């Protein structure tokens, strides 16, 4: 029997008493919902920006349920920024508290990979008329969602650098005891220099330290379904930083394949997609599920085994898949942390413990646990705005320095300052004559000498009292003259420059630090190359001592290879050895002005498609006399390579690896610069220009190839020693949607979708971040699990998930 519907709890924990379910026609409820959403759209799409004369609005970047964001230019400096407007910020308690939370968090954080507040505009209207909040933020051209689902090249180096910046910002955030809870590609802002910043902290929460805080943690929880951690879907009551690491794993997989990893159409479908890859949860996880019906549903499913990540992403980097597997685990305690992920070998290229700071002190969420009214939230937001400006003015006062010379007040009666002359008529002069001798004592006549009397001590002139460190008037005058001269010269050189004012420190980004580290590393490598070169020179001289003394013919003379390049060269050398004797060879045809030999079919054709080879262009036929060694059968690998007998015409055929189809139909990644690229699966065998393909009859024909110049290949491989290690900048970034600035989901897209909230199959699947996000709006459960609205509401209560926006808080909305 269906349970009665209940009104959703607000932020203050109040709830209406439960009542019976009122059966109403579907079209009536749909029309009322459409009117309510249209009203919300009219409220949110207020794009009139009142920013005064300080900023000039350029264009609108995006708008959503919570606000509008536009690009702007500061008139004084010309700096481009993003201004986020939150209209009617105090009409809905949930939205007002979200604004207060985001302002406090962004004021607390100072990190290169977290969006920063540059300014908060003060209200220009009286307090009673204050309704809209304007926040000035960093301007980022695009977001990661737009980059992934566009034609912009996304190499493995891009993926590595984006993941490093994301984990670096996440480590800082988690050290402040803050959980983002809504990480997704559209909330990660990106610019053309591949810099990444985490945005939209409206859903952030603190760590749960007691079971009583679980309900607080799940309040208005609406994380995008495709990136939602299993503990939130299964109500495991274990809410830690591992929630964000699951989202990072989903984003990581989406960058590797350029499509979503778990694009569930509804709650049930989402669980099915996760279990298709990770397998059935362990019995301990199933027993910890808080919702009884969810536990029964999982137990009713047949057991599944996890699928290897190499099968999900064939041809992907092994270290990348190793890190991905440690992020996506059912058990939250088994997932890798952000700090440990930064130490993974996949990110060793960028990892620097000294450049990955923590946040101190931790952020205090005490304000968020209080039951606040609209008026109290408004007062708190105004207080935050004034506090921001007070802090900024305090910092300006600290760094401001006005040059001024204050006269030194001399202490009255100080002898070391006045320095009176010894010949002064004053009675207190220190240099006066010694006093007269005292009168003789009465006694016998001085004709006798008393040997018992001690001779009087010699009278010396008393030295004038002098204080340590005293200076004369002449010295003081010289010092004053030198100071005045220095001051005049400084003021003459720069009248507006303050005396000894510290120069403003230019902010250093993570990319600049990385370039400095790479420059130091490059210099170390150059020194190592010089040492290796000298060592090779000595070895070459030793080898040539017993020979005829002619010049060395070593093609590797003077070149130093890295370990990776050396392994590639050794592999190529093994493949260039003479062919195995099992292969039959056909003698080359007689010389002719225009020889047109064709390759012969091997005795045992290799399985699978053969990738198109690339490499140096073939030389002319007359440049080679006699047979040339050909590549032998390569070692076992993902795709074997064809071999052929030696012949007089060179045909280079370096090895290539052909990728196979992905479990999720993932697109192949563009290989990073300097590494061999993957070929397109299923291509036909390659035939050099000028050579006809074998005829349809399948007659045996001859194949001629020659090894390319080893010196040329070595020089090409050695280019990796001097190339820029950072990923290439984007030539043109697609325009972002503004979601990363916390404006909420796009209402236009929401209104254009059907009320079943399903995601349409087809080419547009990867273009949307997700369907609607709220658990209370998941009407697709009707179709996915055969539920009626009352069942949906009761299950929502059971798994403790509320709505992102309480439409009942709007006074002028109609009740369905």
Curated annotation (Swiss-Prot):
Residues 2-77 are annotated as: Required for cytoplasmic targeting. The modification Phosphoserine is found at residue 720. Residues 701-720 have a biased composition (Polar residues). The active site is at 182 (proton acceptor). Keywords: Acetylation, ATP-binding, Cell cycle, Cytoplasm, Differentiation, Kinase, Nucleotide-binding, Nucleus, Phosphoprotein, Serine/threonine-protein kinase, Transferase. It is found in: Cytoplasm; Nucleus; Nucleus, PML body. The modification N-acetylalanine is found at residue 2. Gene3D superfamilies: Phosphorylase Kinase, domain 1, Transferase(Phosphotransferase) domain 1. Dually phosphorylated on Thr-219 and Tyr-221, which activates the enzyme. Autophosphorylated in vitro on threonine and tyrosine residues when the C-terminal part of the kinase, which could have a regulatory role, is absent. Residues 407-806 are annotated as: May not be required for kinase activity. Its cofactor is Mg(2+). One of its GO terms (cellular component) is PML body. Residues 78-139 are annotated as: Required for binding to MAP2K5. The modification Phosphothreonine is found at residue 733. Its EC number is 2.7.11.24. Residues 433-445, 454-463, 588-610, 628-655, 686-695 have a biased composition (Pro residues). PANTHER family: MITOGEN-ACTIVATED PROTEIN KINASE. Plays a role in various cellular processes such as proliferation, differentiation and cell survival. The upstream activator of MAPK7 is the MAPK kinase MAP2K5. Upon activation, it translocates to the nucleus and phosphorylates various downstream targets including MEF2C. EGF activates MAPK7 through a Ras-independent and MAP2K5-dependent pathway. As part of the MAPK/ERK signaling pathway, acts as a negative regulator of apoptosis in cardiomyocytes via interaction with STUB1/CHIP and promotion of STUB1-mediated ubiquitination and degradation of ICER-type isoforms of CREM. Belongs to the protein kinase superfamily. CMGC Ser/Thr protein kinase family. MAP kinase subfamily. The second proline-rich region may interact with actin targeting the kinase to a specific location in the cell. This is Mitogen-activated protein kinase 7. It comes from Homo sapiens.
